[in-house]
Swiss-Prot record:
Gene3D superfamilies: 3.30.1370.30, 3.30.1490.10. Keywords: Chloroplast, Plastid, Ribonucleoprotein, Ribosomal protein, RNA-binding, rRNA-binding. PANTHER family: 40S RIBOSOMAL PROTEIN S15A (PTHR11758). One of its GO terms (cellular component) is ribosome. Transmembrane segments: none annotated. It comes from the Eukaryota. Disulfide bonds: none annotated. It is found in: Plastid, Chloroplast. One of its GO terms (molecular function) is structural constituent of ribosome. This is Small ribosomal subunit protein uS8c. The gene is rps8.
Length: 132
């Protein structure tokens, strides 16, 4: 049984990315769907779709690579806020990942969004992960 669905999702993406798999299957939750939507908008994955099997919902993420040598788009993906140690930031202290080259995914009162969008709206929240 998985206690941290976000860490499980990020680990599955990281492992599939390391061996250059095209598709990775992730248990579907509202949070994982919101994170997948952000990854698609920011260009880290090609696409994602949901399907249901035996009343369990799953996400299929299509990972993205570039060039003939299939260079990875996602260089690093790491969990920041964990169940044992939550990390919060207000709008003034939102993290800048790799001087703006990467993104931080933030869970706010207005939903899950990137650090750039949260800063433009002037809201803070829980820092879920960094991706670059």
């Amino acid at each position: 049984m998985v206690t941290d669905n976000i860490a499980d999702m990020l680990t599955r993406i990281r492992n599939a990315n390391m061996v250059k798999h095209e598709i990775v299957e992730i248990p579907g939750t509202k949070m994982s769907k919101a994170i997948a939507e952000i990854l698609k908008e920011e260009g880290f994955i090609e696409n994602f779709e949901t399907y249901t099997e035996n009343s369990n919902q799953y996400l299929l993420l299509s990972l993205k690579y570039e060039g003939q040598s299939r260079e990875r788009i996602i260089n690093k993906i790491e969990r920041v806020s964990k169940p044992g140690l939550r990390v919060y930031a207000n709008s003034k202290t939102l993290p800048l990942v790799l001087n703006g080259l990467g993104i931080a995914i933030i869970s706010t009162s207005k939903g899950v969004m990137t650090n750039r969008k949260a800063k433009s709206l002037g809201i803070g929240g829980e820092v879920l992960c960094y991706i670059w």
